[in-house]
C-alpha cells in the first residue's frame, strides 16, 4: 500500500523486530500490489485479511501468518506471525472508530455510541464482518480515546526511531 499507511508501518515494524531490511514499494491500493505479487513482481507483501482473503482461499496467494496474536477464524491453519516468524511481541491490528466533530454534544455522542454498540452485537453484523475476516469490538468513546493515544505513541516511536518520513516512505 501507500507511503505511511498502516500496512506500510506494519511491514516496517516486522522488519525492525526481525532485524531485516525490507524495501517498501508504494502502491495505490491493495489490488495493484496483489496483482504484482501474484505475477511474481513482488516477493512478499503485508496486507489486511479483508483485502487478501479471496486470493488466499483461491490459492493465488499464500499467507505465511496473520498480524494478530491469535489465529484468524476466517483463515484456519494460518498461524500468527508472532509464532511463525518467531517474533513474540509482533501484533498489528487494524481498527476503525466512529468520529464526530469535537463540538458535538455529549448527549449526541452517547446516543451514537449506544446505537453503534448495539449494532455491533447483532448476529447480522457479526456474520457480515466474519465473512470478510473482520470482527467487531464496541466500547466507550473514552476507551477509543485511550486506544487512539496509545496508537499515536506506539507508531510515533517507530517512525522517529527508524527515521521514517514521507520522502522516504
Swiss-Prot record:
Specify whether Aminoacyl-tRNA synthetase is a keyword of the entry. Answer: no
Task: List UniProt keywords, sorted A-Z.
Answer: Periplasm, Plasmid
* Coiled coil regions, renumbered to chain: none
Gene3D superfamilies this protein is in? Periplasmic binding protein-like II (3.40.190.10)
Q: What is the annotated localization of this protein?
A: Periplasm
Question: Is NAD found in the keyword set?
Answer: no
One GO cellular component this record assigns the protein to is: periplasmic space
Q: Name one Pfam family in it.
A: TctC
Give the family this protein belongs to, as stated in its UniProt record: Belongs to the UPF0065 (bug) family.
Name this protein carries in UniProt: UPF0065 protein in clcB-clcD intergenic region
Amino acid at each position: 500500500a501507500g507511503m505511511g499507511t498502516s500496512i506500510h508501518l506494519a511491514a516496517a515494524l516486522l522488519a525492525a523486530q526481525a532485524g531485516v531490511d525490507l524495501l517498501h514499494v508504494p502502491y495505490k491500493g491493495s489490488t495493484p500490489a496483489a496483482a504484482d505479487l501474484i505475477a511474481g513482481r513482488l516477493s512478499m507483501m503485508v496486507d489486511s485479511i479483508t483485502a487478501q482473503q479471496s486470493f488466499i482461499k483461491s490459492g493465488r496467494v499464500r499467507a505465511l501468518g496473520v498480524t494478530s496474536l491469535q489465529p484468524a477464524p476466517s483463515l484456519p491453519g494460518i498461524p500468527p506471525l508472532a509464532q511463525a516468524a518467531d517474533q513474540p511481541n509482533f501484533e498489528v491490528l487494524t481498527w476503525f472508530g466512529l468520529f464526530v466533530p469535537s463540538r458535538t454534544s455529549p448527549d449526541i455522542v452517547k446516543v451514537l455510541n449506544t446505537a453503534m454498540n448495539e449494532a455491533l452485537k447483532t448476529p447480522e453484523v457479526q456474520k457480515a464482518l466474519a465473512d470478510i475476516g473482520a470482527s467487531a469490538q464496541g466500547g466507550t468513546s473514552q476507551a477509543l480515546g485511550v486506544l487512539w493515544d496509545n496508537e499515536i505513541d506506539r507508531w510515533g516511536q517507530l517512525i522517529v526511531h527508524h527515521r521514517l518520513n514521507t520522502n522516504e516512505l
